[in-house]
């Protein structure tokens, strides 16, 4: 019989599941044999008749291999660990077993040495086996050890002779060579060595295996060449499915795994899902029919295109690196050639770039990797259905000018349901995993109906059969929604739990504002930004809903971008147009932001060098000539902007030439030569581009497919341009309006969504000034080694301006010369930042840093004569200015903030010294107490004449302290000198030392607060938070109270000669905390030059009701907020554009472990914030449960709502539940909000008077934790437990002195970890919460003063000295170095001799006695390797005696 007729099933078809329980004796009724220690799979020994308590499934058979226990893969584990997993699991046990035979017998060595195609079940199982082996064994190698490697932890380094002996003795499960060195995987010992006793419990049920904490397969071991055995031909009937997208990937044997593993040198751990051992019959048949039986029978794989590379994620998934464009992609570029349209695919196959996901919660959905979105409907069935419905041919490439979509006349709006014209109908829909099964449109304006846009096939609405497209939604559960915003209605639908029903009253008779059946409506300019776009046709299909629709569904109520009448743009004068053409018609409210104003036109001459791949930009036809469509190589096209009109090329006028002729001219330019371009920028904006794009420039900054330096490709190919870059030598690209680049839509519209959060309406897309007193300029900076060389201030409250802080000498901004301290930042790479949070802007800058450059737009106040204000005697240089229509009221507010200094402003230093009354305050303390005040330093400030020149002030005075008793010191007093020594220009750390060395008394020379402030702004309490006293936003938001008559209002004061007053920065406390974030790439992320990281994940279940595309980080839980806890529309500001938008409600049931539930909480009514999960203990029930994450909001505790709940009540509820707790959680962003962020039920400007104040070290260049990074290991001393060992009191009740640290604050906050003390004395202390933590280790390569990364906590010097009997680290001695991060902010310091904190409580308790604590450090300052924890809740005695370098959580500085 020929091979082609052989149809033997794969061994996975024989896998069966048995569900059993423990019998009355508590036994399972069978014995286990084998195990990795014997080089075998675990398999069933004797199955005792009548002793196995079967619940369902098949019977257990002796000698069968055991693959999984309750979905935990156990192949590769020792018998000890398998038994531990079984012991940990509750009844019933679900065992997956398979009969031995063929390629799977009990011999692990045999199976591991077989070759399988990547992506196959066997290949995945091999990787899982290796992962499990490395929990208990360490690979050995004959190569010399490298710097930073720990012998016995990373590798066992042996001689070649020893290696050969091991191999001969059969002690190695795998062996091979890599780069002429031998590598092997020894059998693990039956009983683990002391080194590996403490491995993580990631193998336990419910855990999520990840790279964190779990031993990884070393790259060298995975890549070693071995004498692999071919599997029997009848068994190998699978071909791999890379990423599960139904696309066949050409085989590559496992020994040729790519040598790139991102930035790390190790291959990652097992993929999240275990292998799927059973497959649908039709899939099996398809495999049988179409796939060869042996890998070598397949045709040779096509080579990857030039400069492409294959790599693997930490979960073992394949991705591809394009070194040409420095981007990564999930899609194999070789397969794009074989791609076919979805309508031509069979029903059981998927188009190129699609992946099918079977989710246990959300059911089956599909991932579109090309457009980075998800949907429930099968794309093939959808495409065929659309083809039948619309019978729409593919549109050929063309250069025709854009046509505007044919929007209909807007119907007369009414809020009175009785005045609606049409047929009323009511229906009841039950919410399913797909939501209600329809999408809505409208509600973007107050006078706009909300209408049904589409009914999703097979959804609840479609099954009900009553709802139709265009139906106006009138009532939702007796609530009239006429006049409600889109976001309001979305939240109403989201608030309905799955499984519950909603009553709808609809009115039929109103057409949609556009015709969804009209093919013309698919013609959306790729870069025109619509408020309500019609469906977009991509690759000839209508089935792609853009992110723009997602915006209209999920964002807050988005104001119209123009306050003009809908058609007013037609009558605008065309003075600014040099070519005499008119802008295209704009219909209704769908005004592109680019078309709502004009800039001053200008001609610019640029010189661009043509490279081997072309010029690095594409052009497209437009009514006025050839415009730059896309910048593919930003660095190669300096000064060029998308939308620029090309006037001349090498002195040849091309304005009247056709697209093809201009392309030919560009082609004829020799490679390597300079080409001179004259471009026209400004005037009326192009119909489809903007010279200063709002969102479009962003796609060049990070999207895998947009930052191409690629030549053009035909747009009708069903694959993204990035994949075939090398195939097309042309450097231009025809512009087809029917086929916008999906990544452009994705990136642009995401940026729109985020830019519209809490931004008031404006008429111009540029933040032009409302008068002649401000000038805008664009600044392009390239990142240097030290970053962009400037600091960012502001953004503490929504609406507060973002300002340029200090410009670092000799940095990029300083050398450029155009950026000045005090400039207001308006755009970052085309993204508007007005009204955004400080963190949002910092993240934009981090993103730009990874791309190596940034385009900034700033506003600067202009003095007489229209010249920009000189700063520091430096001319601003020649800049182009733009003028457009005045903005709305928000512009007035923003500008007025800068019209005059606020009443709280500090005067210049000279004025302070001559005009203000200074006084000396002497504070005496006792031996056992501190001075009782906190100093805040604000050195990094703009250097203009109106800024803070006395940078150190009193930030807090502790009740009952010497500072409080002397009654001469007040919060806000500026400190000029300490003990007669001027501290104005002194670093904070030196001030700390100065006060620490002062002994029992200190003399402070101060400028009293009364001298700095007008009486109207005097604090209501001397010890009140400066944020509450001083911030104008805290007193009265100008947005809420714009009256110029208010004494505090900057509007009421005359304009000073200073160029710009930094409103809100002298006054706003939080900006002082965050102002010292220098604009550098985030050191916790790969540097911008390392582009080989895996692509961003976006494969997320479609969001509930509306099939929303997923967030950038698409492997997070779902996007939609299914059960909004409260209709309250006030939300936290969007602080990070990269944060996963996965606001998903879910329930977690947990049983208490030996040390409690294993999590801690933050927040409560007293802090004006909701309750959040603060941290998870490594070995606690919460982390084993696998669902709870740091930053999740707690909505209910044991069925009781947490709204307005105090911290103490939450603890009480958790304790009252006994051994179990049930929590309703709302998926968070991975960050715990700070206490001064506006809570959903508190005013954004509300102050927290009783909360502690903190400053920051001047050297602190770190941004707060980003959700893209894992939270640090949790602090077990704060887990919830009733026992005395676990402090479950309110984490930050500053009203309870007994719970305060010496500086009046709790010790812990999110991201700060403390070493679990090995000292029995310290562990036994009841006040464990105040026990000292490990000193933060400096990160490798950073100076100690900058090394205070989030995640490291300070030690209480006095407690450390008393409790541990050892000397406390000197950096902590005598001072409490505090940082305000919210309730529970912990002191933090830099390292030995550091003092990198910005707040000081002058506590001198153990100061003179403390000295540095000696201890080993990892080589090179690298972080210590974190050992794993044994699977299960067991703990082996003596594990605490491990070397500190191996202890989890131990920091270098404390060792």
From Swiss-Prot:
<dbReference type="GO" id="GO:0032926">
    <property type="term" value="P:negative regulation of activin receptor signaling pathway"/>
</dbReference>
<feature type="compositionally biased region" description="Polar residues">
    <location>
        <begin position="1011"/>
        <end position="1040"/>
    </location>
</feature>
<dbReference type="GO" id="GO:0097546">
    <property type="term" value="C:ciliary base"/>
</dbReference>
<feature type="compositionally biased region" description="Low complexity">
    <location>
        <begin position="1238"/>
        <end position="1249"/>
    </location>
</feature>
<feature type="region of interest" description="Disordered">
    <location>
        <begin position="205"/>
        <end position="306"/>
    </location>
</feature>
<dbReference type="Pfam" id="PF00397">
    <property type="entry name" value="WW"/>
</dbReference>
<feature type="domain" description="PDZ 1">
    <location>
        <begin position="17"/>
        <end position="101"/>
    </location>
</feature>
<feature type="compositionally biased region" description="Basic and acidic residues">
    <location>
        <begin position="1287"/>
        <end position="1299"/>
    </location>
</feature>
<feature type="domain" description="WW 2">
    <location>
        <begin position="348"/>
        <end position="381"/>
    </location>
</feature>
<dbReference type="GO" id="GO:0070699">
    <property type="term" value="F:type II activin receptor binding"/>
</dbReference>
<keyword id="KW-0771">Synaptosome</keyword>
<dbReference type="GO" id="GO:0001917">
    <property type="term" value="C:photoreceptor inner segment"/>
</dbReference>
<feature type="compositionally biased region" description="Basic and acidic residues">
    <location>
        <begin position="1067"/>
        <end position="1083"/>
    </location>
</feature>
<dbReference type="GO" id="GO:0014069">
    <property type="term" value="C:postsynaptic density"/>
</dbReference>
<keyword id="KW-0597">Phosphoprotein</keyword>
<dbReference type="GO" id="GO:1990090">
    <property type="term" value="P:cellular response to nerve growth factor stimulus"/>
</dbReference>
<dbReference type="Pfam" id="PF00595">
    <property type="entry name" value="PDZ"/>
</dbReference>
<feature type="domain" description="PDZ 6">
    <location>
        <begin position="1147"/>
        <end position="1229"/>
    </location>
</feature>
<comment type="subunit">
    <text>Interacts (via its WW domains) with DRPLA. Interacts (via its second PDZ domain) with PTEN (via unphosphorylated C-terminus); this interaction diminishes the degradation rate of PTEN. Interacts (via guanylate kinase domain) with DLGAP1. Interacts (via the PDZ domains) with GRIN2A, GRID2 and NLGN1. Interacts with CTNND2, CTNNB1, MAGUIN-1, ACVR2A, SMAD2 and SMAD3. Part of a complex consisting of MAGI2/ARIP1, ACVR2A, ACVR1B and SMAD3. May interact with HTR2A. Interacts with IGSF9, RAPGEF2 and HTR4. Identified in a complex with ACTN4, CASK, IQGAP1, NPHS1, SPTAN1 and SPTBN1.</text>
</comment>
<feature type="domain" description="WW 1">
    <location>
        <begin position="302"/>
        <end position="335"/>
    </location>
</feature>
<dbReference type="GO" id="GO:0001750">
    <property type="term" value="C:photoreceptor outer segment"/>
</dbReference>
<feature type="domain" description="PDZ 5">
    <location>
        <begin position="920"/>
        <end position="1010"/>
    </location>
</feature>
<dbReference type="GO" id="GO:0010976">
    <property type="term" value="P:positive regulation of neuron projection development"/>
</dbReference>
<dbReference type="GO" id="GO:0051898">
    <property type="term" value="P:negative regulation of phosphatidylinositol 3-kinase/protein kinase B signal transduction"/>
</dbReference>
<feature type="modified residue" description="Phosphoserine">
    <location>
        <position position="1014"/>
    </location>
</feature>
<feature type="domain" description="Guanylate kinase-like">
    <location>
        <begin position="109"/>
        <end position="283"/>
    </location>
</feature>
<dbReference type="GO" id="GO:0005814">
    <property type="term" value="C:centriole"/>
</dbReference>
<feature type="modified residue" description="Phosphoserine">
    <location>
        <position position="686"/>
    </location>
</feature>
<keyword id="KW-0967">Endosome</keyword>
<keyword id="KW-0524">Neurogenesis</keyword>
<dbReference type="GO" id="GO:0048471">
    <property type="term" value="C:perinuclear region of cytoplasm"/>
</dbReference>
<protein>
    <recommendedName>
        <fullName>Membrane-associated guanylate kinase, WW and PDZ domain-containing protein 2</fullName>
    </recommendedName>
</protein>
<feature type="compositionally biased region" description="Low complexity">
    <location>
        <begin position="895"/>
        <end position="908"/>
    </location>
</feature>
<dbReference type="GO" id="GO:0002092">
    <property type="term" value="P:positive regulation of receptor internalization"/>
</dbReference>
<dbReference type="GO" id="GO:0005813">
    <property type="term" value="C:centrosome"/>
</dbReference>
<feature type="modified residue" description="Phosphotyrosine">
    <location>
        <position position="827"/>
    </location>
</feature>
<dbReference type="InterPro" id="IPR036020">
    <property type="entry name" value="WW_dom_sf"/>
</dbReference>
<dbReference type="GO" id="GO:0032991">
    <property type="term" value="C:protein-containing complex"/>
</dbReference>
<feature type="domain" description="PDZ 3">
    <location>
        <begin position="605"/>
        <end position="683"/>
    </location>
</feature>
<dbReference type="GO" id="GO:0060071">
    <property type="term" value="P:Wnt signaling pathway, planar cell polarity pathway"/>
</dbReference>
<comment type="similarity">
    <text>Belongs to the MAGUK family.</text>
</comment>
<feature type="compositionally biased region" description="Basic and acidic residues">
    <location>
        <begin position="281"/>
        <end position="296"/>
    </location>
</feature>
């Amino acid at each position: 019989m020929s091979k082609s007729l052989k149809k033997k099933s794969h061994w996975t078809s024989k896998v069966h599941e048995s569900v059993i329980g423990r019998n009355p004796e508590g036994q399972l009724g069978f014995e286990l044999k084998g195990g990795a220690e014997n080089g075998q799979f675990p398999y069933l020994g004797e199955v005792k008749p009548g002793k196995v308590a079967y619940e369902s499934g098949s019977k257990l058979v002796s000698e069968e291999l055991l693959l999984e226990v309750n979905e935990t893969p156990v192949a590769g584990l020792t018998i000890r660990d398998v038994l531990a997993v079984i012991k940990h699991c509750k009844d019933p046990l679900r065992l997956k077993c398979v009969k031995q035979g063929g390629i799977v017998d009990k011999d692990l060595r045999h199976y591991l040495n077989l070759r399988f195609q990547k992506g196959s079940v066997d290949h995945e199982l091999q990787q899982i086996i290796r992962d499990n082996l490395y929990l208990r064994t360490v690979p050995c190698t004959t190569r010399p050890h490298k710097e930073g490697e720990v012998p016995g932890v990373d590798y066992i380094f042996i001689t070649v002779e020893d290696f050969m002996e091991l191999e001969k003795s059969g002690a190695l499960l795998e062996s091979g060579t890599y780069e002429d060195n031998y590598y092997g995987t020894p059998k693990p010992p039956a009983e683990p060595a002391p080194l590996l006793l403490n491995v993580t419990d990631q193998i336990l049920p419910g855990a999520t295996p990840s790279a964190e904490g779990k031993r990884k397969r070393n790259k060298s071991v995975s890549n070693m060449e071995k004498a692999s055995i071919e599997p029997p031909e009848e068994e190998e009937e699978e071909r791999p499915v890379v990423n599960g997208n139904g696309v066949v990937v050409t085989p590559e044997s496992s020994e040729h795994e790519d040598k790139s593993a991102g930035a790390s040198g190790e291959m990652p751990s097992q993929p999240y899902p275990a292998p799927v051992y059973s497959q649908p019959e039709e899939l099996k048949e398809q495999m049988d029919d179409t796939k060869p039986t042996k890998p070598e029978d397949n045709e040779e794989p096509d080579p990857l295109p030039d400069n492409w590379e294959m790599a693997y994620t930490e979960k073992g998934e394949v991705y591809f690196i394009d070194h040409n464009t420095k981007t990564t992609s999930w899609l194999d570029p070789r397969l794009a050639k074989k791609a076919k349209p979805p309508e031509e695919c069979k029903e059981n196959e998927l188009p190129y770039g699609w992946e099918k996901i079977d989710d246990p919660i959300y059911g089956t959905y599909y991932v579109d990797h090309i457009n980075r979105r998800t949907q429930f409907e099968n794309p093939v069935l959808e495409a065929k259905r659309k083809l039948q419905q619309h019978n729409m041919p593919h549109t050929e490439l063309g250069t025709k000018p854009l046509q505007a979509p044919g929007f209909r006349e807007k119907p007369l709006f009414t809020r009175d349901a009785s005045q609606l014209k049409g047929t009323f109908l009511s229906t009841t829909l039950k919410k399913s995993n797909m939501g209600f099964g329809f999408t809505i449109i409208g509600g973007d304006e107050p006078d706009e109906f909300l209408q049904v846009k589409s009914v999703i096939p097979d959804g609840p609405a479609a099954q009900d059969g009553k709802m139709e497209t265009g139906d106006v939604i009138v009532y939702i559960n007796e609530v009239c929604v006429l006049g409600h915003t889109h976001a309001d209605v979305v939240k109403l639908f989201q608030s309905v739990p799955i499984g519950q029903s909603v009553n709808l009253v609809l009115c039929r008779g109103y057409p949609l504002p556009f015709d969804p059946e009209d093919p013309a409506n698919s013609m959306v300019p790729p870069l025109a930004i619509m408020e309500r776009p019609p469906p977009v046709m991509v690759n000839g299909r209508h089935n792609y809903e853009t992110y723009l629709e997602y915006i209209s569904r999920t964002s807050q109520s988005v104001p119209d971008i123009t306050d003009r009448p809908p058609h007013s743009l037609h009558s605008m004068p065309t003075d600014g147009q040099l070519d005499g053409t008119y802008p295209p018609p704009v219909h209704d409210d769908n005004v592109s932001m680019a078309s709502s104003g004009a800039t001053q036109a200008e001609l610019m001459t640029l010189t661009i060098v043509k490279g081997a791949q072309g010029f690095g930009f594409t052009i497209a036809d437009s009514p006025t000539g050839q415009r730059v469509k896309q910048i593919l190589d930003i660095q190669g096209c300096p000064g060029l902007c998308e939308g620029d009109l090309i006037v001349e090329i090498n002195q040849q006028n091309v304005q009247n030439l056709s697209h093809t002729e201009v392309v030919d001219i560009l082609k004829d330019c020799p490679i390597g030569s300079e080409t001179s371009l004259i471009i026209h920028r400004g005037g009326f904006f192009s119909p489809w581009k903007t010279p200063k794009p709002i969102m479009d420039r962003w796609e060049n900054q990070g999207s895998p497919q947009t930052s191409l330096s690629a030549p053009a490709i035909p747009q009708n190919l069903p694959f993204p341009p990035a994949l075939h870059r090398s195939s097309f030598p042309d450097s231009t690209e025809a512009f087809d309006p029917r086929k916008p680049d999906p990544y452009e839509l994705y990136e642009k519209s995401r940026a729109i969504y985020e830019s519209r959060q809490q931004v008031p309406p404006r008429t111009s897309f540029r933040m032009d000034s409302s008068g002649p007193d401000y000038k805008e300029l664009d600044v392009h900076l390239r990142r240097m080694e030290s970053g962009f060389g400037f600091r960012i201030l502001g953004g503490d409250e929504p609406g507060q301006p973002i300002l340029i802080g200090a410009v670092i000498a000799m940095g990029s901004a300083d050398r450029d010369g155009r950026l000045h301290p005090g400039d207001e930042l308006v755009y970052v790479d085309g993204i508007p930042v007005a009204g955004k949070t400080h963190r949002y802007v910092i993240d934009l800058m981090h993103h730009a840093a990874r791309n190596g450059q940034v385009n900034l737009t700033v506003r600067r106040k202009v003095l007489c004569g229209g010249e920009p204000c000189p700063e520091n005697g430096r001319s601003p240089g020649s800049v182009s200015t733009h003028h457009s229509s005045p903005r709305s009221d928000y512009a007035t507010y923003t500008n007025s903030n800068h019209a005059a200094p606020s009443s709280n402003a500090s005067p210049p230093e000279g004025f302070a010294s001559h005009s203000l009354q200074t006084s000396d305050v002497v504070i005496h303390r006792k031996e056992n107490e501190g001075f009782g005040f906190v100093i805040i330093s604000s050195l990094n400030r703009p250097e203009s004449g109106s800024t803070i020149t006395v940078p150190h002030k009193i930030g807090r005075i502790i009740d009952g302290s010497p500072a409080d008793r002397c009654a001469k010191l007040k919060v806000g007093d500026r400190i000029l000198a300490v003990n007669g020594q001027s501290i104005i220009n002194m670093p904070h750390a030196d001030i700390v030392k100065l006060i620490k060395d002062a002994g029992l008394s200190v003399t402070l020379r101060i400028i009293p607060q009364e001298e700095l402030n007008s009486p109207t702004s005097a604090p209501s309490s001397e010890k009140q938070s400066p944020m509450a006293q001083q911030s104008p936003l805290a007193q009265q938001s100008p947005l809420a109270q714009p009256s110029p008559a208010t004494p505090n209002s900057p509007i009421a004061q005359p304009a000073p000669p200073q160029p710009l007053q930094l409103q809100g920065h002298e006054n706003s406390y939080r900006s002082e905390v965050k102002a010292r974030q220098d604009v550098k790439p985030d050191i916790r992320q790969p540097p911008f030059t390392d582009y080989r990281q895996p692509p961003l994940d976006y494969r997320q279940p479609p969001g509930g009701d509306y099939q929303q595309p997923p967030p950038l980080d698409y492997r997070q839980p779902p996007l939609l907020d299914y059960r909004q806890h409260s209709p309250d529309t006030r939300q936290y500001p969007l602080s990070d554009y990269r944060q996963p938008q996965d606001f998903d409600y879910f329930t977690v049931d947990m049983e208490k472990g030996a040390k409690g539930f294993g999590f801690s909480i933050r927040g409560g009514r007293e802090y004006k914030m909701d309750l959040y999960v603060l941290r998870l203990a490594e070995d606690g029930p919460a982390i084993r449960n696998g669902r709870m994450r740091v930053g999740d909001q707690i909505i209910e505790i044991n069925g009781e709502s947490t709204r307005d709940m105090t911290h103490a009540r939450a603890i009480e509820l958790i304790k009252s539940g006994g051994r179990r707790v049930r929590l309703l959680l709302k998926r968070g962003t991975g960050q715990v909000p700070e206490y001064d962020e506006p809570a959903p039920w508190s005013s954004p400007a509300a102050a927290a008077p009783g909360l502690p104040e903190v400053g920051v070290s001047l050297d602190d260049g770190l941004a707060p934790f980003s959700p893209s990074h894992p939270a640090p290991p949790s602090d077990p001393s704060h887990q919830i437990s009733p026992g005395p060992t676990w402090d479950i009191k309110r984490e930050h009740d500053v009203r309870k002195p007994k719970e305060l640290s010496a500086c009046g604050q709790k010790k812990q906050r999110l991201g700060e970890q403390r070493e679990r003390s090995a000292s029995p004395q310290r562990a036994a202390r009841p006040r464990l919460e105040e026990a000292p933590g490990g000193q933060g280790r400096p990160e490798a390569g950073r100076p100690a003063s900058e090394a205070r990364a989030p995640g490291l906590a300070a030690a209480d010097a006095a407690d450390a000295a008393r409790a541990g009997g050892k000397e406390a680290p000197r950096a902590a001695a005598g001072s409490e170095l505090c940082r305000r991060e919210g309730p529970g902010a912990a002191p933090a310091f830099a390292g030995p001799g550091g003092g990198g904190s910005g707040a000081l409580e002058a506590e001198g308790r153990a100061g003179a006695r403390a000295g540095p604590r000696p201890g080993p450090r990892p080589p090179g300052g690298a972080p210590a390797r974190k050992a794993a924890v044994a699977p299960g809740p067991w703990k082996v005695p003596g594990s605490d005696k491990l070397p500190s370098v191996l202890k989890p959580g131990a920091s270098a500085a404390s060792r």
